[in-house]
């Protein structure tokens, strides 16, 4: 697995961890990846092939396996970004399920981030996605 596959794997795991891949989540996943330098030279067909391959692995091996394979490939800055994107994607459908919360917690613990950094990233992304009109 290369870094482009690994980063996409974490993002896909985030949207699939609750057992469903909704339309809002799929659109958010695509939007989060398409402007990043890792994917900027990828064609529609390349991206389709990448996700077909990752979805096959996800179905065969599960979310945890996908994350376990992806994390060691990512550098520390890539892990930071992957966690932020995963958290943002969990909020894409405006509801964070228990499964998504548990996934983000587990992902945070598996990353080699400095003490407290993962929690700070999650809090920041939650604040970013909060509807300020809600109490």
Describe the function of each predicted region.
Residues 1-135:
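Small-residue-enriched hydrophobic alpha-helices in membranes
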């Amino acid at each position: 697995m290369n870094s482009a596959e690994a980063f996409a794997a974490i993002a896909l795991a985030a949207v699939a961890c609750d057992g469903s891949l909704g339309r809002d989540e799929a659109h958010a996943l695509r939007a989060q990846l398409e402007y990043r330098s890792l994917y900027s030279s990828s064609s529609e067909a390349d991206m389709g092939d990448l996700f077909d391959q990752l979805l096959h692995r996800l179905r065969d091996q599960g979310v945890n396996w996908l994350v376990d394979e992806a994390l060691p490939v990512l550098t520390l800055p890539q892990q930071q970004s992957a966690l932020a994107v995963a958290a943002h994607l969990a909020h894409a459908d405006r509801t964070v399920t228990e499964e998504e919360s548990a996934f983000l917690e587990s992902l945070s613990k598996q990353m080699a981030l400095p003490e407290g950094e993962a929690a700070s990233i999650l809090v920041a992304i939650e604040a970013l996605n909060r509807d300020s009109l809600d109490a």
